[in-house]
Design a protein with these regions (language model features):
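Binding/recognition "hotspot" determinant
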Residues: 1-594
Length: 594
C-alpha cells in the first residue's frame, strides 16, 4: 500500500507514516577491500519520531532498547531515549543539561554520577546507583547590566530532576550511593501510588538548596540613589505517591526541603538528622536630597522557610545520635508520628528579623525666619518561627535530653514525650523595639503668642521609645487521648501548656519544675524646650492708656455741641495720649534692659 521496495530509501512522507522503529535495506554504493566499488543493500535504521525525542539543538541516541557499557566515562549533554529500556553502565557518568528517558532506566557507575541541570525520566522504574557519590543539582546562571540602572541576577537555569511518571503499578525510584547523595534544588517525583521512592547514602544524605539573588542600583550621585537586593532559595523536593524512604549511614541534612509521601515516610540516619531553615532576605536602601527636603531610608526583612515533612500515614524519624529540627513542620493525615534519637532531640525555633530606619529633614526659609524639622524613626522585630508536629498520635523518645522551644505538638490520640535525662518544655522569645525622635528648630522673627514678637532661636525636641518581649510557649496536647511526660532526671515546664481535652495527663520525673513566664513592655516619652532671644510686646499699662486715649477721642466727638464739654474732652484726650506715649517708652526701655 505504501509502495515499499527493498533497496529504495524511504521518502519523508513514508517516514512520517511509521508506527514503529524499523530496519530497512537501502541500496548504496560501497567500497570493497581492493578499492573497487559496487552496489549493495545496506541496513538503514528508521526511527519513529515522538514528542520529546529530539529538539533543534540536541543530539539523539534512541531505540527500542539502549544498552551502553563503558569502562571509562560517559558525558551526555543530549537526548538518550529508549522505548523499553535504557541501561548505562560506566566508570563514571556525567549527565549535563540533557535528558534520559525510557520505560525503565538504570544508571550504574563504578565511581560517581553527576546529574546537573538534566532530567532522567522513567515510566515504571528508575534506578541510579554509584559506588561513589550521586549528585543531582539544578544549575544557575548570573545576568548583569550596567549604566544608570545596574542590576545583577542569579537565577535557576535548568532544573535537575528524577521522575517516575507511571501512576499505576509498583513503580520504583531508587537512588543509592556508596558515599554521599546530594540534592541541590533538585526534584525527585514518583507518581506511582503503590511505589517506593528511596534515597540511600552510605555516608551523608543532603537535601540542599541553591541560593538565588537579585540586586538593583539606581545612582544619580552619592546623595541620591535607590538600591535593593533579594536573596531567596530554590529548595529540593522529594515527593512520592507511595512510600518514601531517606536513609544515611552518617548524617541526614535537610535545608528547607519539601518531602511528601502519599503513604508512609521514613527518615533514618546512623548519626545525626538535622533539619534547618533557609532564610530569604529582602533589603532596600534609599537616599534623596533636595534644597528643602532630605530622606534616608533603609529596611531589611527576612522570611524563614523551614523543612516540611508530610505523609498520608505514618512518619518515622530515627537518628543514632542527635535529632535536631528547626522551624520544621511535620504532619500526618491519618497516621502517627514517631521521633527517636540515641542522644538528644531538639525542636527549635529560628529567629526572623525585620528592621527599618527612616531619617528625614524638612527645611523652610524666608527673609525673616527659618524652620527645620528633623525626624528619626526606627523599628526592630525579631520573631520566633517554631516547629510543629501534628498526627493521629505522637511519640518522641530521646536517650538523653529532649528540648522543645515553643514547639506545637498535637495528636488526636496519645501523645508521649520521654527523655532518658532531662525533658524541657520552654518558650521561644520574640522582641520588638521602636524609637521616634523629632526636633523642630525655629530661628529669626517668630510670633510670641500675644501682641509682640520674638527675635531668636527656639528648639523643641520629643523622644518616644517602646520595647516589648513576648513568648511563644510549647504546647503538648491531645484531642482525644492521654498525654505522658517522662524524664529520667528533671521535667521542666516554663511558660508552656500541657493539655488533654478528653484524657489524662501523666508526668514522671525525679524533679518537676513548673515556671510562669510573663510578657513585658516598656515605653518612655521625653520633651525638651529651649528658647533664647529678644521678645518685644506691649505692657498692660500701655494697653490701658492707649484704650483710654481712644475713648477720650471718641468722647470729644460726642461733645461737639457743647463748647465746655468740648474743651474738657480735648484736655482729657491730650492727657491720655501723653500717658500712653510715656508707658510705651518705659516698656521699650525695660525690654532693652532685659
Amino acid at each position: 500500500a505504501w509502495n515499499l521496495r527493498p533497496g529504495i530509501a524511504l521518502s519523508e512522507a513514508q517516514m512520517a507514516q511509521l508506527t514503529s522503529d524499523i530496519v530497512w535495506l537501502v541500496e548504496q554504493t560501497v567500497t570493497l577491500p581492493d578499492g573497487s566499488t559496487t552496489t549493495a543493500l545496506v541496513p538503514q535504521v528508521y526511527l519513529r519520531l515522538r514528542p520529546g525525542d529530539l529538539d533543534a539543538g540536541g543530539a539523539l541516541l534512541a531505540g527500542a532498547n539502549v544498552d551502553v557499557t563503558l569502562a571509562g566515562g560517559l558525558k551526555n549533554t543530549g537526548t538518550i531515549a529508549g522505548r523499553q529500556l535504557v541501561s548505562i553502565d560506566a566508570g563514571r557518568i556525567a549527565h549535563l543539561g540533557g535528558s534520559i528517558s525510557g520505560n525503565q532506566v538504570a544508571l550504574r557507575s563504578a565511581s560517581d554520577i553527576r546529574i546537573e541541570g538534566a532530567s532522567v525520566t522513567a515510566v515504571d522504574a528508575l534506578s541510579v546507583q554509584a559506588v561513589g557519590d550521586v549528585t543531582v543539582a539544578s544549575t544557575v546562571e548570573t545576568l548583569s547590566g550596567g549604566g544608570y540602572h545596574q542590576y545583577s541576577t542569579t537565577q535557576l537555569q535548568r532544573v535537575a530532576g528524577l521522575y517516575v511518571t507511571g501512576a499505576t503499578g509498583s513503580g520504583v525510584l531508587s537512588v543509592v550511593a556508596g558515599r554521599d547523595v546530594t540534592l541541590q534544588a533538585a526534584q525527585i517525583h514518583n507518581a506511582s501510588s503503590d511505589g517506593v521512592t528511596q534515597l540511600v547514602a552510605g555516608n551523608n544524605l543532603t537535601l540542599g538548596a541553591q541560593t538565588l539573588t537579585h540586586s538593583t542600583d539606581i545612582t544619580a550621585n552619592d546623595r541620591n540613589f535607590q538600591r535593593s537586593s533579594e536573596t531567596t532559595h530554590a529548595v529540593s523536593s522529594v515527593q512520592g505517591a507511595g512510600n518514601v524512604v531517606l536513609a544515611a549511614g552518617n548524617d541526614l541534612t535537610l535545608t528547607a526541603a519539601q518531602v511528601g509521601a502519599g503513604k508512609g515516610l521514613a527518615l533514618q540516619a546512623g548519626r545525626d538528622i538535622n533539619s534547618v531553615a533557609a532564610v530569604d532576605i529582602s533589603s532596600s536602601d534609599r537616599s534623596s536630597v533636595t534644597r528643602s527636603h532630605s530622606l534616608a531610608a533603609s529596611s531589611t526583612d527576612e522570611t524563614v522557610r523551614g523543612t516540611q515533612l508530610g505523609a498520608g500515614t505514618n512518619i518515622v524519624l530515627q537518628a543514632g545520635h542527635d535529632l535536631t529540627l528547626a522551624s520544621t513542620a511535620i504532619a500526618s493525615q491519618s497516621g502517627g508520628i514517631a521521633l527517636a534519637a540515641g542522644n538528644d532531640i531538639q525542636l527549635l525555633a529560628t529567629q526572623e528579623q525585620h528592621d527599618a530606619v527612616v531619617d528625614q529633614q524638612t527645611r523652610r526659609k524666608s527673609a525673616l525666619s527659618s524652620k527645620t524639622v528633623t525626624t528619626h524613626d526606627e523599628s526592630h522585630d525579631s520573631l520566633a518561627v517554631t516547629s510543629s508536629l501534628s498526627g493521629e498520635s505522637v511519640h518522641i523518645a530521646a536517650g538523653n535530653d529532649l528540648r522543645s522551644q515553643g514547639a506545637q505538638i498535637v495528636g488526636t490520640g496519645d501523645v508521649v514525650l520521654a527523655a532518658g535525662n532531662n525533658l524541657t518544655l520552654e518558650t521561644a522569645q520574640s522582641t520588638h523595639s521602636e524609637s521616634h525622635d523629632k526636633q523642630t528648630v525655629k530661628s529669626g522673627l517668630m510670633g510670641s503668642g500675644g501682641i509682640g514678637f520674638t527675635i531668636g532661636k527656639q528648639t523643641v525636641k520629643t523622644e518616644a521609645d517602646t520595647s516589648a518581649v513576648s513568648h511563644t510557649g510549647s504546647t503538648v496536647g491531645s484531642l482525644e487521648g492521654n498525654v505522658t511526660l517522662a524524664a529520667g532526671n528533671t521535667l521542666a515546664i516554663t511558660g508552656s501548656d500541657v493539655l488533654a481535652l478528653q484524657g489524662d495527663i501523666t508526668a514522671k520525673a525525679k524533679d518537676i519544675a513548673i515556671t510562669e513566664v510573663h510578657d513585658t513592655s516598656d515605653s518612655t516619652q521625653k520633651t525638651a524646650f529651649k528658647q533664647g532671644g529678644l521678645t518685644v510686646s506691649l505692657s498692660s499699662a500701655a494697653l490701658n492708656l492707649a484704650q483710654a486715649a481712644v475713648s477720650s477721642a471718641e468722647a470729644g466727638k460726642k461733645a461737639q455741641g457743647d463748647t465746655r464739654m468740648q474743651a474738657l474732652a480735648g484736655a482729657s484726650a491730650a492727657y491720655s495720649a501723653y500717658g500712653a506715649g510715656q508707658a510705651m517708652g518705659s516698656a521699650s526701655a525695660k525690654d532693652a534692659a532685659q
